[in-house]
A protein has these predicted regions:
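Bacterial N-terminal signal peptides that target proteins for export
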Residues: 1-8
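N-terminal signal peptide c-region/cleavage motif recognized by signal peptidases
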Residues: 14-17
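Charge-biased low-complexity segments
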Residues: 19-275
């Protein structure tokens, strides 16, 4: 699916640049938006309906892409007392536009995340002091999102913290991007190791549980950007080195804030679609 979005092109051109030699990096720049909503799943795992939050603020082309593919999704049936059960779940979806030539973009559904609880019901944040924004990044105008994943004991203390991925909203050399990713990841992980979480409501009594917690470093972006394209350079995804953690893909579909327990999500069995 190729769509011309003048606003996307203007945004990609306006992405802050810190280097003269950045051709290969510019080719990797993407624009994306993360949308939230609900999805109704029948007992057999088929989609019986869905709704996107604040749909009037979402580009019609994006809504059309979702309408084309979401109804065809199929999930692993949810079992309750040994019986398949219909369920309304909460979802977040990342739609990505990647430049193809001078005036076209390939638009696709990159990631999706599904949860049985609304974001506000996924536990209380407890003691989660935000990380310090690295001064060097502020001076250089570098912003981005660090997708942290933490392993928590039954007392709510963080046992392990790991940065799965760091996406940056800046153009720079490959070397500089790697340095900025490392700097922001270190800041996020330093804070994450001091966090305290309440008991995971879905797994009382478990010795440990795992959650994804995105950390957004933003300069002057306090406005609501829901339904708007945002340009960034995606970083590589690295799963945590812990054994026994079931991850349904990377963290890219998660909103920029919140606590998202891992291992209790609904499992999508079919491709997401879009290209």
């Amino acid at each position: 699916m190729r769509i011309w979005f003048g606003c996307i092109l203007a945004m990609l051109v306006a992405l802050p640049a810190l280097a003269q030699e950045r051709g290969p990096v510019r080719d990797r720049v993407e624009a994306s938006m993360v949308l939230t909503g609900t999805i109704d799943i029948a007992a057999d795992g088929k989609v019986s309906g869905y709704a996107i939050d604040r749909a009037a603020e979402v580009p019609t082309g994006v809504l059309g892409l979702l309408a084309r593919f979401v109804p065809g999704w199929r999930f692993e049936p949810l079992m309750v007392d040994g019986q398949p059960t219909a369920k309304r779940a909460y979802m977040s979806v990342r739609v990505v536009a990647k430049r193809q030539g001078e005036d076209a973009f390939a638009v696709s559904i990159r990631n999706a995340s599904f949860h049985q609880q609304a974001p506000g019901q996924r536990g209380t944040k407890g003691n989660m002091r935000p990380p310090r924004y690295p001064h060097a990044a502020i001076r250089a105008g570098v912003s981005g999102t660090v997708y942290t994943i933490v392993r928590i004991d039954r007392d709510g203390r963080v046992l392990d913290a790991f940065a799965e991925q760091v996406d940056l909203r800046v153009l720079a050399s490959e070397y500089a991007l790697a340095r900025w990713r490392e700097l922001m990841a270190d800041a996020a992980l330093h804070a994450a190791r001091q966090w305290y979480f309440p008991e995971h409501p879905d797994a009382p009594g478990d010795d440990t549980w795992v959650a994804r917690v995105p950390v957004d470093f933003a300069i002057g972006r306090g406005e609501d950007r829901y339904g708007q394209w945002q340009a960034y350079v995606p970083g590589p995804w690295q799963p945590p080195p812990w054994t026994g953690v079931r991850l349904a893909g990377g963290p890219g579909a998660l909103p920029a804030s919140g606590i998202f327990p891992v291992g209790h999500d609904l499992q999508l069995l079919t491709p997401m679609g879009g290209q």
